Amino acid sequence: MSNGALPNRSDVWLQSLGWQPTPEQEQQFERLFQLIVQANQQLNLTRITDPPDFWEKHLWDSLVGIAPWLQPDSSIQRQVSFSVDHSHPLKVIDIGTGGGFPGLPIAIIKPTWRITLLDSTQKKLAFLQQVNAELGLENVETCCDRAENLGQQSPYRESFDLAVIRAVGPASVCAEYALPLLALQGYAVLYRGQWTAEEQEGLVAATSKLGGELIAVSPVKMPHSQGIRHCIYLRKIKTTDPKFPRRVGVPARKPL
């Protein structure tokens, strides 16, 4: 079990995202860290429990994907060539949330947004419900299901403004999970490590079949480890064909 507190990285938040958490949000981040570490031995939530690594790979990494929504000018700061509407709260789904990332950090800093944490493991979701109560988060709900099922169900299908998906599978598979859940003009953020031209070609082809388009690929340097991450942004531009998503397991076995 890891000991110690999260590092204070207020300067890094500001330099990298043009944004800083409030003192209350910093306290919620710290409490989230402690709760994850305490439960980790029983639930196997994450291999990352060292405080600096947790800050970078779970907190900073979760929020870098929504940089365009943090500040009106952050799309310029993050070299993302599109602008978003900051005038209304968003309805968000975190697909395959696991230990609650990126959904919980997003819920902490965006209390007016409605966040749905989707996962197929009820034990993890039961823990996340306890975390929500402990952190006083009233804008989070959990859903135990598979994205392939949820994407075919009302009221979930084509109802979300934003889908975030991290460490779930190949990009084209993530697109099939996410795009059917998005309302028209909704966005999906795919959190990736390395990114290749071949992956991009496959994603563009899959996205076009699902009613979406690839609008930006944003490479970002991690502030502590100096590794490169990529945030892939998709936009829903037309209604998804009713045959998508396909049955549970099919997208992963037979990617578009």
UniProtKB/Swiss-Prot annotation:
UniProt keywords, alphabetically: Cytoplasm, Methyltransferase, rRNA processing, S-adenosyl-L-methionine, Transferase
E.C. code: 2.1.1.-
Gene Ontology molecular function terms on file: rRNA (guanine-N7-)-methyltransferase activity
GO cellular component term of the entry, any: cytosol
Pfam families: GidB
Residues holding S-adenosyl-L-methionine: 96, 101, 119-121, 147-148, 166
Predominant location: cytoplasm
Superkingdom of the source species: Bacteria
Subcellular location: Cytoplasm
CDD domains referenced in this protein's UniProt entry, alphabetically: AdoMet_MTases
Similarity-based family: Belongs to the methyltransferase superfamily. RNA methyltransferase RsmG family.
Entry function: Specifically methylates the N7 position of a guanine in 16S rRNA.
Descriptive protein name: Ribosomal RNA small subunit methyltransferase G
Gene: rsmG
